[in-house]
Amino acid sequence: MTPQQYVQQKAVASGSSFYYAFLFLPAPRRAAITAFYAFCREVDDVVDEVSDPGVARTKLAWWQAEVTKAYAGQPTHPVMLALMPLATDYGIEQRHLQAVIDGCQMDLEQTRYLDFAGLQGYCHLVAGVVGEVAARIFGQTDPRTTEYAHRLGLAFQLTNIIRDVGEDAMPVSYTHLTLPTTPYV
């Protein structure tokens, strides 16, 4: 299986409607967003699918090292092998990938946010940065567009959190997030 086939399979297997939207993009942009999306899925799946927090931390540390190696020209994982040839063309920087990993790390360290500022910081890492990268891949360079894409990412993440409140309120050993207790101003 080639790296491109791997990221394609990862995107399809996620069941997300985003994948089908990607199909309308020109092939080079579609390849870039699919590889980036596969990266996000891989990292997020660590938190969602690994029940032992110690193992999850180890896997996220591995991804941090893989990103560092990839930007040094030595990627090994199929996702990074697919993404790196496109990263320069679309302005996908190491800090973007690191932010996504940092956000997933927050999932392991903090399960509740008591104010909107804390929740917004988390959403910035796991979704705002994703919006910014998507805007770059889609060819947008205007800083205002990047800011709007960032805010759209935040809105998507907040919507996901609200959607999952019932599920997260169920008595389990891990509660993903709760809504903040102070109003947003």
What are the roles of these predicted feature ranges?
Residues 1-177:
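Acidic catalytic motifs of isoprenoid enzymes
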Residues 176-185:
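Single conserved hydrophobic/aromatic residue that forms the stacking wall/gate
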